[in-house]
Amino acid sequence: MSEAELTLRPMTRAEFDEWLPRQVAGYAALIAASGAMPAQAAREKAERDTARYFGSGAATPGQLVFRIMDGEVSVGWLWLGVPGPDPDPLMAWVFEIEAAFRGRGYGRAAMRLAEEEARARGMTSLGLNVHGQNMVARSLYDSLGYEVTAMQMKKTL
């Protein structure tokens, strides 16, 4: 992979329609795996949260969904969005490199592209959420200079 060849391409409507159910299922699985709530409640939360951000489908204002492309090959996807009335920071809500392409520098290069996208839109920062059990992602974000701004913890009794 050459960083020069890596690009963000807006998803087509068909790609979005295929991606969205996978996104909901993946988000629900992360919530349930964290122990925050049972699987069914996690699924319902994932559906509500996703519907809130994509009320108008792929063309919802403030939400940007990209394929991460290495030349003509899709290696992952990225969802950037405005979380509320204050547009800054832009949030990297979902960022995933396909399993077959992990460990080859795509994640680092894609995050740099996300930062460029935020700058191009006049943002002064790019935020993200990382689940506590995702040590690979946490290590990547630390190495790129991201700082912890909030943390949730729990103890099962």
Whereabouts are the PLM-identified features?
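Short glycine-rich hinge loops at helix-strand junctions in the catalytic core
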Residues: G105, G122, G145
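Acetyl-CoA-dependent GNAT
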Residues: L6, P10-A99, E117, V148-L157
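Residues that form or flank phosphate/diphosphate-binding pockets in enzymes
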Residues: P87, G105, V136
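Conserved amphipathic alpha-helical interaction elements at protein-protein interfaces in regulatory
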Residues: G103, E116-A120
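Conserved active-site alpha-helix within GNAT-family acetyltransferase domains
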Residues: R108, R112, G132-A150, K155
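Actinobacteria-biased recognition of intrinsically disordered, low-complexity terminal regions
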Residues: M1-E5
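Conserved GNAT acetyl-CoA-binding A-motif
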Residues: P89, M111, R119-N129, Q152
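Active-site acidic-Proline motif in GNAT/NAT acetyltransferases
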Residues: E98-A100, R104, G132-Q133
